[in-house]
Amino acid sequence: MFKGTVLLLATAAWAAGAVTTTLNGKPAVAGDYKPSEVTDLKLDNGLLSITFGSDGSATSLIKNGQELAHNLMGIIPRDTDAHRTWYIDYSGGGGRLIADVIRIVEVTPQMAHIAVIDNGENNRFPLEHHILMLAGESGLYGYVICRNPNNRRLGGEMRTMYRLDRNIFDWAYVSERTGQQPRYGDLVKLKQVQDETWEMPDGSIYQKYDYSAYYSETPMFGHYGHGFGVFFMPVSTEYYSAGPLHQELMVHQDALILNYFQGAHYGGGGGDNFKDGVKLFGPWFTYVNAGDNAAVIADAKKKVAVEQAKWPYKWMKEPLYPLDRTTVTGQLKGAGAAHAMVMLAKPGVDVYKQGGDFIFYRQADASGKFSLPAVRPGTYALHAYATQGSVTAALEKDDVVVSGSSLNLGTVEWKTPGYSSLLWQIGKADRMSGEFKFGDQLRNIKWIGMVPADLTYTIGKSKEREDWYFAQGKVGNWDVVFDSKKAYSGTAHLTVAIAGVSGNPKVTISVNGKEIKALAYQNDAATYRAALRSGVYRLEDISFPAELLVAGSNTVRLGMTGVGKNGGIMYDTVKLEIE
């Protein structure tokens, strides 16, 4: 075992407001330690203290003299980690980081840096869980290095977990909602509707996925109450899979914060294929503050802006985390350019299915101009999709080589297929169904049960927010009725852009009684897990003889012939065009 010299005197450093690091009650020495040599490893900067045990998880978290990480809750044997916090698991909790080495990387008055290392024996993933405390910061930074040289399946998820004292932290916060979640111990006594879903005594439905949210909309999430808050801040989304439409479970009952740096609850990319067989996830910041409920949220919002402005972190000393970054700019030209979502990612694969590399995204302005800051050096494809209007075709421009402090791509032409006449359109092309009825509500599976089996939507009379729903979720017919002043010849195109599917739905599409397409999809679990706006995007451009349309009244029917429980199709937009 290597051990260096003691780099600080604990008493003097604490008095100066710096970081102290003690191992088994004595000033810590940098080096590698067997778990059996670690009884307690404590980091303290006067604002916060945290102690880790021999398995690499935390045994204590103290702010202002208050212990925040005791009385941890969960259901055993259902959750074998019910009494642990600050740890990593994967494959739906079926695998976890096992500490082979606890490394004290750096011990200075400015920083304590430790790493819990799993060498990957017995078919486990080789993992490094790095945890850092900086002087003057009431929180902990972290990152994970995962090695996967043989491209093994990650089982759909890998995450860091932060369990807190539920007696203190009885409120949950994500971008979409705040609320008091029930305790697992109470939930297991109730009627279970489906997995992780219960009927409450008042008849309402609670599902842990009610507290999912989009990473692109959620700069922080966590728990708070009784004078304290703990908020997880991703700081950057570059290391998450699936891009701007990636949504994940972030917090749930028993005061648990979940950082799914690999997650596919809604069909997004699992990210199994890492470049060179290794990927660094993070760094992130877990902020611990104090105050009343409103104060801790307001303070955390200010803090996350401060942390984002520091990116990339100059104190990071990892070859896998380049500090030299590039600002990539340009201007899209084309029908879908205004306010388009612009991304740099791998070529050849829809961004939502990516995860092994890094993804950068920003929304363009009204003129199509975009700026992507802090991009890692490398070769990317430029991807874009519309967030308004009628353009459903995506842009991909390959071989974008990023280097230097800035890269101006100039004008990027976005050529989209267009037809001579748009007869009608329902919704806007943004890969989401949020503009339709219930699409703006808080997540809950009750909404999919409230959509009608049959409806008639009349072009020119019906309203999207009132008469078209976020999803079609029952066997029945959704009819679009419209008048045409004339008959047509040639080719017509019905575009059905789908924001998500659940429950293996089957839909037969017909025009004036003539079937033109039968759709059948696999499950992305979006509506099943209370999503209201998106899952896996799909696009159908269905051509048919324009002669099927007549002068007078016409009907396009979306006939659902089969769907699983709480499943359905979420429509992004539906439009009819003539060549």
Model regions: which residues?
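A short, solvent-exposed beta-strand micro-motif common in secreted/extracellular proteins
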Residues: 368, 378-389
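Acidic (Asp/Glu-rich), glycine- and aromatic
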Residues: 131-132, 136-183
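Acidic-aromatic substrate-binding/catalytic surfaces of carbohydrate-active enzymes
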Residues: 37-101
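Extended, loop-rich substrate-binding clefts of extracytoplasmic carbohydrate-active enzymes
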Residues: 81-147
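A short, amphipathic beta-strand motif
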Residues: 326-334, 368-370, 412
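Structured interaction patches on ligand/partner-binding surfaces of diverse proteins
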Residues: 387-411, 415
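Short, acidic Ser/Thr/Gly-rich low-complexity loop/linker segments typical of extracellular
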Residues: 350-369
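Beta-strand-rich ligand-recognition modules
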Residues: 475, 481-489, 497-579
